[in-house]
């Protein structure tokens, strides 16, 4: 029941503005990095190890030494704050609102807060495409993968520990997991661990996303075909799966060349219909986010309680 309540709280309220675990995790990563940084694989491994232990050990101790009621409150708060359904919707909707007002400059600025690519040179179509890509990818990273590790951890009595460990790795990847001069070696373990941890959730979650969105597809057979043919068309081993699911549902073209920190990466395209992307396409992507997240929650609860 606590999993369901935490999920619903996130849907209604969204992320807490104060005392958010991710802010604490991010600040801790910065402090450890400042202390041990050298662009070496071993130092990057230590960053990963120390950050996980700093958070997981106290949670495990609290689980085993405090009253059950106190731990349940902590558990509820952690789950609620680490599932990002509402915040993903809320932050990306700001870009949509700017597009509705034809304020491209503001849309590019707001988009830069939710993607890691350079948004300064994007046109309206590219903004819409980037928005759909980030919603689809973060449906996995921000919702489905956390639920997956929550369920997996519950089977071994370490649900919160595994959820927090996943979010730490995910945060590390977003902060140091780049193939640039500074982080090529130092961020290697964080990036690779994130790839491994998302491997199963990306595949299961993308299938759930595809099934959730087939109602909105004009050609179900074609949607499935696009997904199957394009799911590996990404430099990341996982990002192509949710993007291919959405590209199949909407019958649009995603991915392609993108600029990150001054470097242009020539990615393969996902999908082949180069039609204009509309705001309605983004609305459908939101529906897939909410439907697939809800379905996955029910699947997760079924796994935990053996339904």
Task: Explain the meaning of each model-derived region.
Residues 1-165, 169, 177-307:
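Hydrophobic alpha-helical transmembrane segments
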């Amino acid at each position: 029941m606590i999993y369901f309540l935490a999920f619903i709280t996130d849907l209604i309220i969204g992320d807490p503005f104060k005392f958010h675990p991710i802010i604490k995790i991010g600040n801790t990563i910065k402090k450890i990095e400042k202390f041990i940084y050298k662009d070496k694989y071993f130092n990057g491994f230590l960053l990963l190890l120390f950050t996980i232990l700093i958070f997981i050990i106290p949670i495990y101790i609290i689980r085993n030494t405090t009253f059950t009621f106190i731990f349940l409150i902590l558990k509820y708060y952690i789950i609620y704050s680490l599932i990002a359904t509402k915040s993903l919707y809320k932050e990306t909707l700001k870009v949509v609102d700017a597009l509705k007002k034809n304020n491209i400059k503001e849309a590019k600025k707001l988009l830069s807060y939710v993607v890691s690519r350079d948004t300064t040179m994007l046109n309206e179509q590219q903004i819409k495409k980037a928005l759909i890509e980030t919603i689809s990818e973060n449906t996995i990273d921000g919702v489905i993968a956390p639920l997956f590790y929550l369920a997996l951890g519950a089977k071994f009595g370490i649900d919160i520990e595994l959820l927090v460990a996943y979010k730490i790795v995910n945060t590390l990847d977003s902060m140091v997991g780049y193939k640039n001069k500074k982080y090529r070696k130092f961020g290697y373990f964080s990036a690779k661990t994130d790839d491994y941890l998302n491997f199963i959730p990306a595949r299961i979650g993308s299938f759930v996303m595809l099934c959730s969105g087939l109602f909105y597809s004009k050609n179900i057979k074609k949607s499935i075909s696009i997904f199957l043919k394009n799911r590996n068309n990404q430099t990341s081993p996982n990002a192509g799966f949710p993007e291919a699911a959405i590209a199949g549902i909407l019958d649009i073209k995603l991915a392609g060349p993108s600029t990150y920190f001054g470097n242009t990466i020539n990615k393969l395209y996902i999908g082949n219909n180069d039609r204009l992307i509309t705001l309605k396409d983004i609305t459908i992507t939101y529906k897939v986010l909410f439907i697939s997240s809800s379905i996955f929650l029910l699947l997760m609860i079924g796994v935990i309680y053996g339904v």
